[in-house]
């Protein structure tokens, strides 16, 4: 089967779920290609990108996007003008039908820039807004094949995305062969938005448990080692985590908190660390490849990710980073946010605080640091949860069966 992954950018270091799906389907013998609208971060990339020679399998529809609205439009216009009379290019200017992706010249630029159609048995598209674009490209004969769209988080929660695609999504629901939300929460939301229930199948983003060695920690380090692995964005709740650490320090807690990742909030988080007098115990260490992240997980005592709904409505799906921590036997502390309670049951397979509640987080961390919780049954239950319900092998086998039936 010819399976083509379609994304807005590739590779993206934080989107390991896309990379892992790509390499899995290569491993089981599929003819795999990747189409990305723009090149991703080719500097901060994971080893699998090179190991599988994915650069040779990836087609970029447009060059690197320029910064700034005016520069973007000028770049796209320069691509469009030589092909302005091409029938598909003219049709792509139908703003009433194609919306913002037309008015911002994204769709016309793609149609103008690509001479031949891309054919596949199935286009597996990650994120709803990319699905909306791919669906239009099918209509304009740039893509030829069936389409399956995966909904993750921001694509179905962020207000400006929902507003921009309020006409696109109903058409996507009607014309796509299948919609794959990653949580039951998003399944219910898709149905509420008008998607036929029979077109929906929940597909989990999972991990490969055998690649994560379960380690039962006999004793906690002193100082306590707390770890987060996340993009530095609002919905990851890292500002709340830092505030919880400030409270924990005031209560006499002795700890080292390491945050792996990069993003737009780096300067803001550094300020929060300095303002909280936490520079001696909270460190931002930037991007780390997957192999090095495993070492950090192995050496930590607690994994912390108190996700929350951002001011613009942006929400998580179910963070893979939590699954990885659960697989290695790290006690996980998170929040009652989005699909996370589908992964973590409070006091059973981890600990959950209300969204944005730094006091509650600090109380959980203090309780764990003082040995007041029986951790071993919880981490064993967490490992069992990811092995059975968030196991990449099971999830991808089920996905392959779905795609085979569809093709």
Swiss-Prot record:
Its EC number is 2.4.-.-. Pathway: Glycan metabolism; exopolysaccharide biosynthesis. Gene3D superfamilies: Glycogen Phosphorylase B. Transmembrane segments: none annotated. Pfam families: Glycos_transf_1. One of its GO terms (molecular function) is glycosyltransferase activity. Involved in the biosynthesis of amylovoran which functions as a virulence factor. This is Amylovoran biosynthesis glycosyltransferase AmsK. The gene is amsK.
């Amino acid at each position: 089967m010819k399976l083509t992954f379609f994304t807005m950018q590739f590779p993206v270091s934080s989107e390991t779920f896309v990379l892992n799906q790509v390499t899995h389907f290569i491993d089981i013998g599929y003819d795999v290609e990747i189409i990305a609208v723009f090149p991703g971060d080719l500097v901060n990339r994971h080893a699998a990108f090179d190991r599988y020679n994915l650069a040779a399998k990836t087609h970029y529809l447009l060059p690197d996007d320029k910064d700034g609205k005016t520069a973007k439009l000028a770049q796209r216009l320069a691509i469009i003008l030589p092909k302005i009379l091409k029938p598909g290019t003219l049709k792509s200017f139908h703003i009433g039908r194609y919306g913002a992706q037309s008015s911002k010249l994204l769709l016309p630029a793609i149609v103008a820039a690509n001479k031949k159609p891309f054919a596949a048995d199935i286009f597996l598209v990650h994120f709803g807004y990319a699905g909306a674009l791919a669906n239009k490209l099918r209509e304009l004969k740039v893509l030829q094949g069936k389409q399956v769209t995966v909904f993750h988080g921001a694509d179905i929660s962020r207000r400006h995305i929902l507003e921009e695609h309020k006409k696109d999504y109903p058409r996507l629901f009607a014309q796509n062969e299948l919609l794959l939300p990653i949580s039951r929460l998003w399944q219910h939301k898709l149905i509420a938005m008008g998607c036929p229930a029979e077109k929906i199948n929940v597909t989990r983003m999972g991990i490969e448990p055998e690649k994560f060695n379960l380690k039962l920690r006999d004793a906690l380090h002193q100082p306590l080692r707390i770890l987060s692995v996340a993009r530095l964005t609002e919905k990851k709740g890292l500002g709340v985590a830092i505030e919880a650490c400030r409270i924990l320090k005031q209560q006499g807690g002795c700890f080292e908190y390491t945050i792996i990742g990069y993003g737009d909030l780096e300067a803001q988080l550094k300020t929060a660390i300095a303002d909280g007098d936490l520079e001696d115990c909270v460190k931002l260490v930037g991007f780390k490849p997957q192999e090095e992240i495993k070492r950090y997980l192995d050496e930590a005592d607690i994994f912390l990710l108190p996700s929350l709904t951002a001011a613009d409505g942006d929400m998580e799906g179910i963070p893979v980073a939590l699954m990885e921590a659960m697989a290695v036997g790290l006690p996980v502390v998170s929040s009652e946010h989005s699909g996370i309670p589908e992964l973590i049951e409070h006091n059973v397979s981890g600990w959950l605080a209300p969204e944005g509640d730094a006091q509650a987080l600090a109380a959980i961390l203090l309780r764990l640091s003082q040995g007041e919780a029986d951790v071993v049954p919880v981490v064993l239950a967490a490992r069992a949860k990811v092995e059975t319900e968030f196991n990449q092998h099971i999830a991808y086998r089920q996905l392959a069966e779905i795609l085979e039936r569809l093709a």
